[in-house]
């Protein structure tokens, strides 16, 4: 066992740097716990507000004896021209704050350097989010290997790798509507230029920030990926080859959450009582409920949210609808009451205004479908729970994840969204799927057609394989062992 080797020969000390966004921090905290369970000393470096978000989960982990500590560094907001109170990416109210936010983040280099000079034992390895390129300078200065965490799947990472190597593909497209085929891929997959998370034109200061991230990616020792070999074998192998063998699939990391409290409190505290939510689910038939959640930074226009609501109503199926960023959606709240929507669906629709205990909901036997924005955390949690997916991608890696889910894995149905909804530009897009489209897609996913039955069968199988992957002897469990052995060799005092 690596945990025994770790203690007896040379104590490993990993320093983790999560990016300050909910979807990035959640898996990084899970990774911290997985490594600590193997006897690795873990130090998480983050800001006070972000540390508070995970206080309960980490306190339980520390009380159970796991060697985890948190070091807080103050974000230099004022010096970077960032208004106070914008310590997390998902709290930014305007795209104009993006550049000052990343400036503030990269200014953490100096205080973090001082921390490293005083750390004991000396760190053996850094695990850093892709969005924190300054950690490469720390790794170089202290001669420590840096492992990168992107928060994406191997399908998406390999797609980006191929397109970076063949930039002319995107550059030669005549318009943003034109489709292209990704070359050298195991499956035939088509995208438009905006659908891939690889910007061909980025203005001014934002371009420099992006280039720093790409450069830091190239110089990292390796990459850990929150996926499992059995889910996307051809893409996991292809990406590992692209990284000269230094890529480890260690997921689904969410499966380290064994107890109800940990499942319910990943990230922000849920805005619904856990028991109330489970009681509501218990009252529904097996596989009958559609769970609807479009992510932590989704703010679709009111016109689209109305169509989504009316489509859910007309589907005649029970549903849970999570509306996050609730304070931004006051008009929707008014529409719920004034139009009579909330009253009409009260017997079969549960509206959660804020944060939901997503893992608990997806694991419940009455849930038979998940309408998702295809963020990788949500996508993987759905598959791991054996729940078929109804895909509604918005931006970033989400169209890549949709292609994997619908075309390659065949565990979901597309809602029909083809156009990218960039953050801050939602109103320009308007309605992409009307109520009839929503109703049709729900029926396609949750009906009794042969295709729907096949999707349900396939996702159940992949869910079972996910649980096997993280058990002792499973692919992800073995990959963590391999990673630790690799770092242990590098960390020996005579190296």
Curated annotation (Swiss-Prot):
InterPro entries: UDP_glucos_trans, UDP_glycos_trans_CS. GO terms for molecular function: UDP-glucosyltransferase activity. Belongs to the UDP-glycosyltransferase family. It is an enzyme of class 2 (transferase). Gene3D superfamilies: Glycogen Phosphorylase B (3.40.50.2000). GO terms for biological process: saponin metabolic process. UDP-alpha-D-glucose binds at residues 358, 373, 376-378, 381, 397-398. It comes from Barbarea vulgaris (Yellow rocket). An anthocyanidin binds at residues 24, 396. Pfam families: UDPGT (PF00201). The monoglucosylated hederagenin 3-O-beta-D-glucoside is a feeding deterrent of the yellow-striped flea beetle (Phyllotreta nemorum). The active site is at residues 24, 129. This is UDP-glycosyltransferase 73C10. Its EC number is 2.4.1.368. It catalyses: oleanolate + UDP-alpha-D-glucose = oleanolate 3-O-beta-D-glucoside + UDP + H(+). Keywords: Glycosyltransferase, Transferase.
